[in-house]
C-alpha cells in the first residue's frame, strides 16, 4: 500500500521563470529516452522481439529511475517538455493524475492527435477517438453492451460456459505436454474472446483476429503510416457477418438489442473490445506466473476456488485482485494520453490549449519513493480498499474515461485462471521470480513458461 505521496527530501519546484516548470533540453531528451522504449515495445500491439530486448536490458526499470530523478529536479509536474512542433507536459504527481482523469473529456480530451492517427487504422469511429456528442453517444452504447459497473455481465452464464470449455481444452493440452507457454495460452484465450464477443460461430475464425493484429501493428506507427483502408474494410465486413448472427449470450446479441444513435456505428465499437482483450491475456498469464511464484498467495487463490462450480458464473474477488495487481505491476497501457481543449490553470501557471498530457502509469505504479509495495506482489490492496483510494493507481484508467469493459475483463480473466489452477500443480520455469526480491519492472509474457503436473 502507499506511503506519503511526495518524497520528504524533494526540493521545491523551480521553474526558472513564472509558470509551470519547463524541462531543460537535456532533461527533455532524458524523458524521451525513458518513454521511447515503452513506445517501441508497441503501444497498440506488442512487438515480441522488442519486449524481449527491453526486459533483458531492464529498460522499464531504467525509465522509472529517470522519471524519479526528473520529479526530484522539477517537482512532481506537470513538467513541460521542449518537443519540436508539439506542446507536451509530463504528469508525475498522483493528485494531478486524479484531476486530469476526473476532468475527462473537458478540458482533458482522450482523443489526442496521436491516438486518432493510430486507432484510425482499425476503429476510426471508436469511443477513444471521439469527442463531444459523438463520444457521449458511443460511450453510452459501450456501457450498455458491456454492462459497465456490474461484476457479472447479464450474459455471464453463457460466457462462463465458453470459458470453461476452452479452459478445459487448454487444460487437457497442459496435462498432456506437461507445460504451459504463451503460444498455447493465447490460442485458447483468443477462442474465448471470439466466443464472448461474437458468439460460438466465431470460435475458429483465427483470420479475423490475425487481420486485426495486422491493423494494430500498423497502428503502432501512428501518423507515420498511411491507413490500410482496404484491409480495414475486409476486417469490418468479417465482423459484420458475425454480428448479423447475434448469437444468444454474446456481446453481438447485446449489440442487436441496444438502440444506437446514428453517430455510434456499432460495427466500429467491436475492434476496441477485441483489442482490449488481447493485452488482458498477457495480464492473465503474468498473474498466473506471479501467483505460482508466491506460494502463500497461490494457496489463498486455491482456497477461494474451492469446490465452486466453475461452469457457472462466479465472482472471485481474490483472483480479480490478482489480475488487478498484475496490471498494476506491468501496465498494459503504460502511457495514458490526454489533450487540453483550452488553456488550463494550474498551481504555478497555465497550460496552453492543445497540450498533450503524458501520464506514465508504469512509473507511477512503480515509484518506490512513494509506494511501499512498488516492487512486490500485493493483491490484498485491491481487497482492503487501499488501491482504490490511491489516485496514482489507474490499471483501467479512471474517471469518466475509465475502461467500460473493466468488469467484463476481470470476470473473464479470473474465471479462466480458476480453471487452469484447479486439479494441477504448477511450477514457474521462466522467468525467474524470487518472492523475496524486488519484482522486475518488465516481465515478458511471451517468455512465460510453467511446468504442469495433474493432481487428479
Where are the language model's segments positioned?
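Cytochrome P450
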Residues: 2-44, 74-80, 87-91, 95-98, ...
Amino acid at each position: 500500500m502507499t506511503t506519503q505521496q511526495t518524497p520528504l527530501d524533494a526540493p521545491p519546484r523551480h521553474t526558472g521563470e513564472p509558470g509551470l516548470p519547463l524541462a531543460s533540453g537535456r532533461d527533455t531528451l532524458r524523458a524521451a529516452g525513458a518513454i521511447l522504449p515503452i513506445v517501441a515495445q508497441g503501444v497498440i500491439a506488442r512487438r515480441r522481439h522488442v519486449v524481449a530486448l527491453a526486459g533483458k536490458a531492464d529498460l522499464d526499470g531504467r525509465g522509472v529511475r529517470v522519471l524519479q530523478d526528473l520529479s526530484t529536479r522539477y517537482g512532481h509536474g506537470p513538467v513541460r517538455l521542449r518537443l519540436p512542433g508539439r506542446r507536451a507536459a509530463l504528469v508525475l504527481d498522483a493528485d494531478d493524475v486524479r484531476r486530469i482523469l476526473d476532468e475527462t473529456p473537458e478540458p482533458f480530451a482522450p482523443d489526442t492527435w496521436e491516438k486518432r492517427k493510430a486507432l484510425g487504422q482499425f476503429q476510426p469511429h471508436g469511443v477513444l477517438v471521439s469527442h463531444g456528442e459523438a463520444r457521449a453517444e458511443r460511450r453510452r452504447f459501450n456501457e450498455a453492451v458491456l454492462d459497465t459497473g456490474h461484476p457479472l455481465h447479464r450474459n455471464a452464464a453463457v460466457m462462463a460456459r465458453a470459458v470453461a470449455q476452452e479452459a478445459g481444452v487448454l487444460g487437457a493440452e497442459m496435462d498432456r505436454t506437461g507445460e504451459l507457454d504463451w503460444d498455447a495460452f493465447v490460442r485458447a484465450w483468443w477462442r474465448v474472446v471470439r466466443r464472448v464477443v461474437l458468439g460460438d460461430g466465431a470460435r475458429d475464425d483465427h483470420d479475423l483476429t490475425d487481420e486485426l493484429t495486422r491493423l494494430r501493428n500498423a497502428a503502432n506507427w501512428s501518423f507515420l503510416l498511411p491507413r490500410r483502408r482496404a484491409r480495414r474494410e475486409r476486417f469490418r465486413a468479417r465482423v459484420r457477418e458475425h454480428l448479423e448472427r447475434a448469437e444468444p449470450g454474446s456481446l453481438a446479441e447485446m449489440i442487436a438489442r441496444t438502440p444506437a444513435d446514428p453517430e455510434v456505428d456499432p460495427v466500429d465499437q467491436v475492434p476496441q473490445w477485441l483489442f482490449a482483450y488481447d493485452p488482458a491475456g498477457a495480464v492473465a498469464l503474468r498473474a498466473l506466473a506471479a501467483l505460482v511464484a508466491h506460494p502463500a498467495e497461490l494457496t489463498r487463490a486455491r482456497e477461494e476456488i474451492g469446490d465452486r462450480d466453475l461452469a457457472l458464473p462466479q465472482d472471485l474477488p481474490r483472483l480479480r485482485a490478482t489480475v488487478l495487481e498484475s496490471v498494476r505491476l506491468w501496465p498494459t497501457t503504460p502511457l495514458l494520453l490526454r489533450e487540453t481543449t483550452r488553456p488550463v490553470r494550474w498551481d504555478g501557471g497555465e497550460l496552453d490549449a492543445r497540450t498533450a498530457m503524458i501520464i506514465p502509469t508504469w512509473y507511477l505504479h512503480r515509484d518506490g519513493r512513494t509506494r511501499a509495495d512498488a516492487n512486490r506482489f500485493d493483491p490484498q490492496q485491491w481487497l482492503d480498499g487501499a488501491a482504490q483510494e490511491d489516485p496514482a493507481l489507474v490499471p483501467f484508467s479512471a474517471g469518466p474515461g475509465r475502461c467500460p469493459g473493466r468488469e467484463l475483463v476481470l470476470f473473464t480473466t479470473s474465471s479462466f485462471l480458476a480453471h487452469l489452477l484447479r486439479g494441477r500443480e504448477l511450477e514457474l520455469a521462466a522467468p525467474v521470480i524470487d518472492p523475496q526480491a524486488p519484482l522486475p519492472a518488465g516481465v515478458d509474457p511471451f517468455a512465460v513458461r510453467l511446468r504442469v503436473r495433474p493432481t487428479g
